[in-house]
A protein has these predicted regions:
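Hydrophobic cores of alpha-helical transmembrane segments in multi-pass inner/ER membrane proteins
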Residues: 22-33, 80-89, 104-107, 127-136
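Membrane-proximal helix-loop-helix units in multi-pass membrane proteins
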Residues: 46-101
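Juxtamembrane loop-transmembrane helix junctions in multi-pass integral membrane proteins
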Residues: 11-16, 41, 66-70, 116-119
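Transmembrane alpha-helices of multi-pass eukaryotic membrane proteins
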Residues: 17-26, 42-47, 73-75, 96-101, ...
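N-terminal topogenic module of multi-pass integral membrane proteins
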Residues: 1-40
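A glycine-rich, hydrophobic loop/mini-helix early in the fold
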Residues: 24-25, 29-62
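Juxtamembrane "helix-exit" motif on the non-cytosolic side of transmembrane helices
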Residues: 36-40, 59-66, 88-93, 110-117, ...
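Terminal transmembrane helical module of multi-pass membrane proteins
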Residues: 92-138
Length: 138
């Protein structure tokens, strides 16, 4: 039976071929960058740095480190920058996009309350990527 990992990055340790993790995350970063650039050309540097952080997250498990400081810094940076991009892009779009953004974060809060805070990092990573896709498609 599959368990939900503590974070998306923890999945690398359950894979048969860990190098596939890096390729998968780089593909996600490339698709995320493409979505972000196609939605708004005004914030391309923000999109690039955000997805570059995510790309580094993909490569970090291959570098053996006990404290994973760079991994955490890149992960947090990628999540924060992607959400900044969501907010500034949503502000330039019609008002329903802003309402959708606020509603989605409220739903995330409800999920965390129902899950009693378990696996918060995993759900936050999934939610940030879902927010990027949702705002890019709006």
């Amino acid at each position: 039976m599959m368990r939900i990992p503590d974070s998306i990055s923890a999945m690398v340790y359950t894979m048969r071929h860990p190098h596939m993790w890096t390729l998968m995350v780089w593909a996600i970063a490339a698709i995320g960058y493409w979505l972000m650039c196609s939605a708004s050309e005004d914030y391309v540097p923000l999109a690039f740095v955000s997805m570059a952080c995510i790309g580094f997250v993909g490569a970090m498990p291959l570098i053996k480190s006990d404290d994973n400081t760079l991994h955490w810094v890149c992960g947090i940076g990628g999540c924060v920058l992607s959400q900044v991009w969501c907010v500034v892009t949503a502000m330039a779009k019609p008002l329903p996009t802003v309402g959708l953004l606020v509603t989605a974060w409220a739903v995330y809060g409800v999920v965390m309350v129902c899950a009693r805070g378990r696996k918060w990092c995993f759900w936050l990573e999934v939610w940030c990527m879902a927010m990027v896709v949702m705002v890019a498609m709006a």
